[in-house]
């Protein structure tokens, strides 16, 4: 594994990637942002990531399918699910199927940074949460 934690961030809402990509880069993650789950899946087939952050509900493919693919092909990868408040039961189901953690929308970038730091520690890596600097 390189020094930087490799993160794939998938959410069909453009603002999520726009805000969270730079927030994660500040703590030492190398982030690839996707809005299209099909494109994200194609990338996952070519590259292994340390952490995958995915929305559960998307149009073409849902986050549960991404979770299942990652679990089958890269069991070391930690998957963090993003969900709306109305989908907490679905997030719990994702945890039962092997997701590392989940975050309910709306959330702050610091909330995701904390979960990323926890996932990095579980992988034996680290990110510098304190270098995040100013809140977003």
Predicted regions, residues:
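The short loop immediately C-terminal to the conserved phospho-acceptor aspartate in CheY-like receiver
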Residues: 52, 56-57, 78
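Short hydrophobic/Thr-rich beta-strand motif most characteristic of the beta2 strand and flanking loop
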Residues: 28-35, 43
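Short amphipathic alpha-helix used as the core "switch/output" element in two-component signaling
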Residues: 42, 64-76, 93
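The feature encodes the CheY-like receiver
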Residues: 17, 59, 87
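C-terminal output helix
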Residues: 89, 107-117
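Acidic catalytic/metal-coordinating carboxylates
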Residues: 35-36, 62-65, 83
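Conserved acidic segment of CheY-like receiver
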Residues: 4-15, 20-24, 52
